Design a protein with these regions (language model features):
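N-terminal type II signal-anchor transmembrane helix
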Residues: 1-27
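Flexible, surface-exposed loop regions and adjacent strand-edge segments
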Residues: 101-109
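Short acidic/polar mixed-charge low-complexity motifs
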Residues: 28, 59, 183-185
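Flexible beta-edge/linker motif
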Residues: 36-101, 115-137
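Elongated, acidic membrane-bridging lipid-handling scaffolds
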Residues: 24, 67, 109-215
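Short, intrinsically disordered, charge-balanced linker/junction segments flanking boundaries
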Residues: 217-219
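Short beta-strand elements
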Residues: 31-33
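Short amphipathic alpha-helical segments
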Residues: 10-14, 18, 64, 208, ...
Length: 219
């Protein structure tokens, strides 16, 4: 009975613990709706994460993620003898906002140590991150007409973020991603970088094709 009670109560305890940590994020505040645990495979799911700006009247959240799953990377544990995790973000949204002259109405992510916030959600280091069907948007609600530029259907991956694998003596992490710009123009991006540096050396490639400029006429 004790084990059953612990099994039932633990997700609520974890959720309350995380919400307590995310309540104080500098200029932002986070909240989680629910947590599901799968201890037998070293994984847990976060449902309904939302991060909003504390000051200013910004009409959209900075981050909204219906589902996030973190799990121990058994491949890295078995082959590289490293205890690291993989993250899977499903349909996440990020909204950047230009508030114009009203700086309080802007939303850029400044004012918070985001690496520290990620450490609150996950006690071990992330080595791989996958983003499935995400969206990145830029808004200006004060301009006339209003600006709304977005990349949808964002599918991307970050690999080797902790340098578990050295590639020919180099400490290379890499990023690969695809999306649709303004809902129709294929966008591709890839990068390599040293995850332990301050991005002093990195290579980034970006390409967008077949963008219909008439879609930008309103701006």
């Amino acid at each position: 009975l004790v084990l059953i009670a612990v099994h039932i109560a633990l997700p609520y305890l974890v959720r309350n613990y995380l919400n307590d940590k995310l309540a104080n994020m500098g200029d932002y505040r986070g909240e989680i709706a629910d947590v599901d645990l799968a201890l037998w495979r070293g994984a847990y799911r976060i449902n309904g994460l939302q991060i909003v700006k504390v000051d200013g009247k910004v009409p959209v959240p900075f981050v909204k993620a219906p589902l996030i799953e973190f799990a121990v990377s058994w491949h890295s544990l078995w082959y590289d003898h490293a205890v690291v995790a993989e993250g899977h973000f499903v349909r996440p949204q990020i909204n950047f906002v230009d508030g114009g002259a009203n700086k309080q109405a802007s939303q850029t992510g400044k004012g918070t140590d985001w690496q520290e916030q990620l450490r609150k959600l996950l006690p071990i280091t992330l080595n791989e991150v996958r983003i499935e069907d995400g969206e990145i948007a830029f808004h200006n609600f004060s301009s006339k007409p209003q600006v709304n530029i977005n990349a949808t259907a964002v599918n991307a991956s970050f690999y080797n973020l902790t340098n578990v694998v050295d590639v020919k003596g180099k400490r290379d992490a890499r990023f690969e991603g695809k999306a649709l710009l303004q809902g129709q123009a294929p966008l591709e991006a890839n990068a390599t970088f040293d995850p332990l540096s301050d991005f002093e050396e990195f290579e980034f490639r970006f390409r967008a094709r077949d963008l219909q400029l008439k879609r930008m006429n309103d701006f």
